[in-house]
Amino acid sequence: MSRDLIRALNDAWRPLETDADLDAVLERVGDRRVVLLGEASHGTSEFYTWRARITKRLIEEHGFHFVAVEGDWPDCWEVNRYARALPGAGPGAHDVLHAFHRWPTWMWANREVVEFAEWLRSRNDEREPESRVGFYGLDVYSLWDSMDAVLRYLEDVDAEAAERARNAYGCFDPYQEDVQEYALASRYVPQTCEEEVVGILRDLRHKAGRYLSETLRGGDADPLLARELLFDAQQNALVAKNAEAYYRTMVRGGAASWNLRDLHMVETLDRLLAHHGPESRGIVWEHNTHIGDARATDMAAGGMVNVGQLVREKYGDDDVLLVGFSSYEGTVIAGRWWGAPMEVMHVPRARRDSWEDVLHATGRGDGIVVTDALARVADASARRGHRAIGVVYQPAHEMHGNYVPTVLPDRYDVLIHIDRSSALAPLHYRADDDGEPPETFPTGM
């Protein structure tokens, strides 16, 4: 392990104990339009908690307009509805988030997000409706939920268009809401549902002005709400189009489906920025594998792009801040296979000579590293493994598959290191828990 690198890390290190210590991050924000906050797992309390703390300060001190997360648009729209006190909102953040039903539920249905959503609601209650901060989902997985949302909107504004959309979306009926069945069928049957979802999106965009003017014609409708509901419907139609392409592409393997997903997330981010106006600023919450620049990893060699890379390329390095997270050891919520029950798992000490190992070797505990301070150190430009834990995790095998070769100063502008981390607190328990959490279930924030 390089002494020069350890010395450089110690020089760049800023301790992390209180909200005031986040000044080291906030000082880097300046006038940047997009701040992307990562996570090294989808089940670590400290990643969620510190990310929320940074976000609160970005909203209060820098006037950011929305939070966009690695979640489904329809589910996150209900959080947005509650946080902004829009008509039809649920009674509380716990109820809204507990209704998240797609595995892995714990990603957003957890106490850490409940606390943030309640804070956002309280903060928004003090603002005029047009100044309230929103909460949105960037992901592409909600094919059927998004089609249902489009139909509900059209039924309210255009019965004939709703019937046409119902017939078009009926193309998916044989697959009984099973995306795997549709994906496999598209591999062997030349006739897919692509034209149908593209057509509905095109029609909805073409008639958007008419729908808005007709909704407002009577004079009783709330203009802000009318615009929000139209935007929601258009986004759901876009999700349906891109989800169809994603599942059709997924069965072919390779980088194409990954790229399509991240391109969709960037397209959604672009739409949110445009929707909130030319001076708008957005905060993104996603896994490190999405927000860290792919060009600084081995992803690029595999033909993969990601959100961090694409946003830097689109808006420029000076208008984007990428903040990654890491942990040396601890516990995490994950499943042992896709769809498996959630578990509290032990995260072993990081692999020797990984970035986590080097950060631990400083002996500084939890801290913040502004990575441009490392650019002058030759060892910092070498690729080292950087741990990435997804919703599926098998600790016994992590040495062979959970480390992404990374040039740290190129991948992130800032890294937040939690030396010993703990599992987050999901709202759902497994069916076989008999309603009682296991002894190892996290009880604190």
Describe these PLM feature segments:
Residues 1-445:
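Structured catalytic-domain cores with a bias toward divalent-metal coordination
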